[in-house]
Design a protein with these regions (language model features):
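N-terminal pre-ligand scaffold of iron-sulfur
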Residues: 1-88, 103-104, 118-140
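Short cysteine clusters
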Residues: 71, 95-98
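Short cysteine/histidine-rich metal-coordination sites, predominantly Zn2+-binding motifs
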Residues: 85-94, 109-117
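Short beta-strand His + acidic residue motifs that chelate non-heme Fe in jelly-roll/DSBH
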Residues: 102-103, 111
Length: 140
């Protein structure tokens, strides 16, 4: 386990059934989030061994959101490593390969080949002004 992830073996085990452990990765300080900017967070590699990252940003309502950086049309990062995640007007996440536009508030594609599909949402946990990305549901 890296210094950036925490495991809580009792996570969700209130009914006596075994539950998956909480695995969280340090995201960023809440104060680092600025409207119109995206913070990328490296995630543990999954079964495919490909690098993965989360995109942490503020929705139009000012609440933090987090999505897996993976287009819904093809399983590739929306920025292809360029670190350019947003449209010029900063109103949508942009897949640089397909031109898909995703809403900031819910990650739903509004234009492009994956119309109406949503980016994978990753839960955020906030503790004392620090945001952690819950990666428990991702493939190990």
């Amino acid at each position: 386990m890296s210094e950036n992830d925490d495991r809580d073996p009792g996570h969700g085990a209130s009914d006596g059934k075994a539950a998956s452990p909480l695995i969280r990765v340090l995201g960023c300080a809440r104060a680092e989030l600025v409207p119109g900017e995206v913070v990328s967070v490296a995630l543990p590699r999954g079964a495919s061994r490909r690098p993965r990252e989360a995109l942490v940003l503020l929705g139009s309502d000012g609440a933090p959101r987090c999505y897996l950086n993976e287009c819904r049309h093809l399983p590739i990062p929306i920025d292809l490593g360029s670190k350019r995640y947003l449209t010029n007007d900063k109103r949508h996440l942009l897949c640089g390969t397909h031109g898909a536009l995703y809403r900031l508030n819910d990650g739903v594609c509004v234009t492009g080949p994956c119309l109406s599909l949503a980016l994978t949402t990753l839960p955020l946990i906030e503790e004392e002004g620090v945001l952690y990305v819950d990666v428990s549901a991702l493939d190990p």
